[in-house]
Design a protein with these regions (language model features):
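Short, aromatic/basic amphipathic alpha-helical patches
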Residues: 62-72, 219-220
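Amphipathic alpha-helical repeat scaffolds
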Residues: 35, 122-128, 237-242
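Active-site/ligand-binding-proximal alpha/beta "capping" segment
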Residues: 186-235, 240
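Structured adenosyl-cofactor binding patch, chiefly the S-adenosyl-L-methionine
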Residues: 134-136, 147-164, 218-258
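RNA substrate-binding interface of SAM-dependent RNA methyltransferases
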Residues: 44, 99-192
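Glycine/small-residue-rich loop that forms an oxyanion/phosphate-binding "nest" at active or ligand-binding sites
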Residues: 68-97
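Boundary-proximal intrinsically disordered activation/regulatory segments immediately upstream
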Residues: 1-62, 147-148
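Short acidic-hydrophobic, aromatic-tinged amphipathic segments that line or gate anion-handling sites
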Residues: 3-6, 77-80, 166-174
């Protein structure tokens, strides 16, 4: 098979638009995962790709060949190394990407543990929270309007595959969240003296974590139990990714380790 050389190729053009344009991802309901690790994590969940784009050199890479073997050959597009470098967003790594359909889930009544991201923007923090939530067994994630898109290529890379194991509901208005989430809300706050270690976290919890600068919105604070994380050295606040991870693991400790 001769590799594609033109950036005007429809498959290449579409993938590049998905990588760079939120409106294209929103309109098509698709996104792009880049690199061997993410593609492997995606396939390991039993999920199906729409298209794979791989550079000519990478198509013979020992980590890539087993992955390509799991994919219908009609879905594989080989392009020249120089063309791949024009469209990729990763600066290094093995040159392979896949176009995938963004999963669509219906938000029903939530009675178990869940994570609510309220206006978070930093992809690093979001990735940390998704990975940690998945690690402790939280499987449902809800975002409010104005939260970063969890299926953007940057968030996908930061999540390192956690997205594929989670049920994600994005851009859900506050009133719908209050109507659907029956689990008690807990929110980190600097305006309470009751630290997390004095709370009973044995029962299902809906963790609310807010914007990096503004914190959790007043709509949630009015409905949630506020908890504090002890900071004896007087730091003003913790990184939200770190704060959320501490909460999740204290919950896990109480439930499984007494």
């Amino acid at each position: 098979m001769n590799p594609i050389t033109s950036p005007a190729n429809p498959t290449v053009k579409h993938a590049h638009a998905l990588l760079t344009q939120h409106r294209t991802r929103k309109k098509s309901g698709q996104t792009v995962i880049e690199g061997v690790h993410l593609l492997d994590a995606y396939l390991n969940q039993g999920l199906t790709v729409t298209t794979v784009i791989v550079s000519q050199t990478a198509s013979e890479h020992p980590e890539v060949m087993p992955l390509l073997g799991q994919i219908d050959t009609t879905k594989i597009t080989i392009i020249t190394d120089s063309l791949y470098k024009q469209i990729r967003s990763l600066g290094d790594g093995v040159d392979i990407m896949a176009v995938i359909d963004i999963p669509k889930h219906h938000l029903g009544q939530i009675t178990g543990d869940c994570l609510i991201l309220d206006g978070l923007q930093d992809t690093g923090n979001i990735g940390t929270l998704l990975r940690t939530a998945s690690a402790v067994g939280i499987t449902t994630v809800i975002t409010t309007p104005n939260t970063a898109h969890l299926w953007s290529p940057k968030c996908l890379r930061a999540g390192m595959g956690a997205n594929f194991a989670l049920q994600i509901f994005e851009q859900i208005p506050h009133d719908e969240i209050f109507a659907k989430v029956k689990t008690p809300l807990y929110a980190t706050s600097s305006h309470t003296d009751k630290v997390i270690y004095h709370h009973n976290l044995q029962n299902p919890i809906a963790w609310v974590l807010g914007h990096e600068g503004q914190g959790v919105s007043q709509q949630f604070l009015a409905q949630a139990t506020a908890i504090a994380l002890p900071q004896p050295n007087g730091q003003e606040s913790l990184n939200v990714g770190v704060a959320g991870s501490i909460c999740f693991y204290e919950m896990l400790r109480q439930r499984q380790y007494g």
